[in-house]
Structure formats: C-alpha cells, structure tokens
Amino acid sequence: MNLQFCAGMPKYLYPVPMTLLHILDLLSTFVFALVGARVAADKGLDYGGIAFIAGIASVSGGTLRNIFLGLRPIWIIDPWIITSIIAAVVITLVFRRVTHVGKTLLIMDTFGLAVATMSGTQLSFEMDVTWFAAILLGVITAVTGGLLRDVLCQLEPVLLHRETIGTSALMGAITFVALHQFSFGDNICAIVGGSVVILTRVVSIHFDLHLPKFTK
C-alpha cells in the first residue's frame, strides 16, 4: 500500500496502526454518532436524516480540527470511522422503541466530550502548535458536533444556553496542557484531563451551575 500521502502526518493518522489517539477518535466518533442519531430519531427524522445527523455530530469537530492543523479529515482515510457511525445508526434503529434513555444519553455525551477533548488536544501537541492553540482545538473538537446537531435538529443549542459543556472541555484541555508542560506522559495527561472534563460537567449539572447570562 502506498502511504506517501501521509508523509509528515502524525503516526496515528495512518490507516492501520491502533494508537491511543486513533482509539480516542473512534470512541468519540461512535458515542457522538449514537447520541446524534438518538436525538434525530426523537425529533422524528427519517432514516436518512438520522444517518446524516449522526455523521455531522460525530465527525464535524475532528474535521474542523484537522483543517486548522492542515491535515486531511481522518474519516477520509480511515474506514473504521465510517464503520463506527454506521454501527451507531444501526443500534439506534434496532433499539428505537426503547424509551427513558435521557440519563444514558447524558452519560454517553459526557464521556464523548471528555474523549474528544483529549483527542483534539493531544493531536494538536503532536503537530507542534502553541499551548493556546492546543487548548482551543481541543475544545473545538469536543463541542462542534453537538452544536451542529442541535441546530440541525432545531433544538436550543445546549452549548450556548445550558450547562457548562464548553467550560468542561476547556478545563480538561487546560489540565492536559499543564500536565504536558511538566513532562507527564500522554496517557496520564489524557486520563487526568478527561476525568476533569467529566467531573466538571457532572458537578455543574448536579448543582445547576452555568455561566452568567446577559440581562438587560
């Protein structure tokens, strides 16, 4: 197989190796696709609409991240990404009659948020960007899909109105960068940073914490 088109790209972007970054991308893709498909199904979209929303919700953040980094979107060269989206859609359709999945979706979305934040931040560091850019791209990777999902499903964007999704991703990305600056390994940075994302969101939901809103 000719892999010359991958020259200069991080190792995890090759089609074959299963590195930590690759696994993180697959996990976040599957989770975001599953949540997106369920949200679309609950809005009464047809099968095509469900598949479209699942795809947009799962790959838009990583695609935007890679564009900023001058890389090809990972789903173009890695068939496992598309496979994970298809699997998420199929699971949603098979279990479409299952109700009361709100808490389950919230847990999965929180997990996906943590994984995507770590994936975006770590990849940015591999591309030798500044620490500020790494944090920003980590947040972009995590929140873009959910924002587009809500807009396309004609829902009030959770990112802009409720909870602390953006803040949670920001805190996790900052944690990753801080640990990285102290020469901790990528695995430790990702585990601790991801835990911060999850903890921040869980605490904010439990105590109904959110950023202050503008009032006239």
Task: Write out the residue ranges for each language-model feature.
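Ordered, amphipathic secondary-structure segments that act as subunit-interaction surfaces
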Residues: 87-124
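Structural signature of hydrophobic alpha-helical transmembrane segments
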Residues: 19-29, 73-86, 130-142
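C-terminal ends of transmembrane helices
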Residues: 33-43, 66, 89-103, 147-157, ...
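Small-residue-rich transmembrane alpha-helices that serve as helix-helix interface/gating elements
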Residues: 140, 190-203
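Helix-coil boundary and interhelical linker segments in multi-pass alpha-helical membrane proteins
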Residues: 18-20, 67-76, 121-133, 178-189
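N-terminal topogenic module of multi-pass integral membrane proteins
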Residues: 15-69, 74
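Cytoplasmic-side transmembrane-helix entry/capping segments in multi-pass membrane proteins
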Residues: 48-56, 78-82, 102-113, 137, ...
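Short, structured motif recognition centered on aromatic/hydrophobic residues
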Residues: 52-56, 63-69, 136, 140, ...
